[in-house]
Each structure stands twice: as structure tokens, then as C-alpha cells.
A protein has these predicted regions:
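Phosphate-rich cofactor/ligand-interacting catalytic cores and adjacent structured alpha/beta frameworks
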Residues: 19
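Intrinsically disordered, low-complexity polyampholyte segments enriched for Lys and acidic residues
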Residues: 2-6, 231-234
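Sec-dependent N-terminal signal peptides
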Residues: 4-16
């Protein structure tokens, strides 16, 4: 996997439905908290879902799959398609993307059917994002990737979820970077502005970083320097 593809895969995978990515130092206590819940109730599907996504954040994809499979098993036993099975498919799909396993698209496809039937747009945002990453990072199909990311943008508008919109905009700008196409600058600047509107240092960072890549493609090196300074200072 080349450096550009690794960049988009690591930075922009939406894990679960939450975009407020936890700091590494907070992941272990969060994992321990959810494990305590499971000790009291081994069939607590919300704890299983949280553990699946926390291990995705921790980049322990095999552990994420372990909890995703447990969530799927219990969800199936309880016939809980709206939560258990849906989020099991999302978590498993994302974990398999990170492992470069084509099994991912089967899980994401099943999740898409369930989310559409329940009109769960916040879940669809994550699913479309995963499908876009699958298309770009496993098949190098940038056209399909953009299609999925824009579908995700439409879903964020329906559920009014600006943080997810910003992450999807980041993926769109990254695809244009992979194509050596500075068209992505427009989307990078939108992320940067959304980051300020939402007071999100993470989104400001991503917007500034992507903008600097776009200015590099445009050979506007003074703007690269400016946005790297902004990124450092969170301005």
C-alpha cells in the first residue's frame, strides 16, 4: 500500500457513528469500563458495540472483529436487527477494510440494507464512508469512492450531522489528492470552516492538512506554509 493510500485509510475511517475520536490515553479506561459492564451482563449489546469500535480506534482489528462477531451472534439470537445486527455489520465491515479483506463489502452491504429499511441516516453516513474507503483502498476505484462519499454527504444533510459531513468532505478531498486533482481544495476549505464552526481542533487539523496538500498540487507554496502554521496553532 503506498503512502497516499495509507494516509486516507488511517486518517478518515469513520469508526462507529461517533466522530469525536477519543484520545489514545482515554481508550484503555473506556475499554475497561465496557468490559466491567460485560462482566455483569455478557449479553449487553451496547457494551459489545462500544468495545468493537474502541478496538477499531486502538487499531486492534482482530479484537474488534471478536467483539463484532459476539454482537452479531447475540443480535441474531435476539432478532435485534435495528441495533445489534446493524452495528455488528458496520463494525465488522470497518475492521475488515483495515485488514484489506474483501469480506468487508459483504458486511457493509448488509448494513446498508438494514439502515435503509430503518431510515437510519446516521448509520448510512458511516456505511457509505466505509464503502467509499473500500472502493478506493482495495480496488483503487476512485469514481465509485466519490459516489459513495457524496451519498454519505446527502445522508448527513438528512440527519443534520455536521461532524460526519466534515469527515466525508475530508475523504472526498483526499480522493482528489490521490488523483492529483486540486479540485479537492474546495472540500478541504469547507472542512476547515466547519471545524471552526464546531470548535473542533480535529476537524481544523484535517482541513488545514488537506488544504496544504491541495496547495502543493497548485504549486502555491506560500499557502502551504500558512495552512501548516494554522494547523499547528489550531487557528
Amino acid at each position: 500500500m503506498n503512502l497516499k493510500l495509507k494516509y486516507i485509510l488511517i486518517i478518515f475511517l469513520i469508526i462507529g457513528i461517533q466522530v469525536r475520536i477519543p484520545a489514545q490515553e482515554t481508550i484503555l479506561p473506556a475499554i475497561q469500563q465496557q468490559e466491567q459492564i460485560l462482566k455483569r451482563n455478557p449479553e449487553d449489546m451496547r457494551a459489545l458495540k462500544e468495545l468493537c469500535f474502541l478496538y477499531l480506534h486502538k487499531a486492534d482489528y482482530h479484537k474488534a472483529i471478536e467483539y463484532g462477531e459476539r454482537l452479531f451472534k447475540i443480535g441474531y439470537e435476539k432478532q435485534d436487527y435495528k441495533f445489534g445486527i446493524l452495528y455488528a455489520h458496520i463494525g465488522l465491515g470497518q475492521a475488515y477494510i483495515m485488514l484489506g479483506d474483501s469480506t468487508a463489502i459483504n458486511h457493509l452491504g448488509q448494513a446498508k440494507l438494514l439502515a435503509e429499511s430503518e431510515k437510519n441516516d446516521s448509520a448510512l453516513c458511516s456505511i457509505y464512508n466505509g464503502m467509499g474507503l473500500y472502493a478506493s483502498n482495495i480496488h483503487r476505484d476512485y469514481y465509485s469512492a466519490l459516489h459513495y462519499f457524496f451519498e454519505g454527504i446527502e445522508a448527513t444533510h438528512r440527519c443534520q450531522y455536521q461532524e460526519l459531513e466534515a469527515i466525508l468532505l475530508g475523504n472526498i478531498s483526499s480522493i482528489y489528492y490521490l488523483k492529483d486533482d486540486p479540485t479537492g481544495l474546495t472540500y478541504s476549505l469547507q472542512i476547515y470552516e466547519l471545524g471552526h464552526q464546531l470548535n473542533s481542533a480535529y476537524l481544523i487539523f484535517i482541513g488545514a492538512l488537506n488544504a496544504s496538500y491541495m496547495y502543493y498540487l497548485l504549486h502555491e507554496y506560500d499557502m502551504i506554509r500558512l495552512y501548516l502554521i494554522y494547523k499547528k496553532l489550531n487557528l
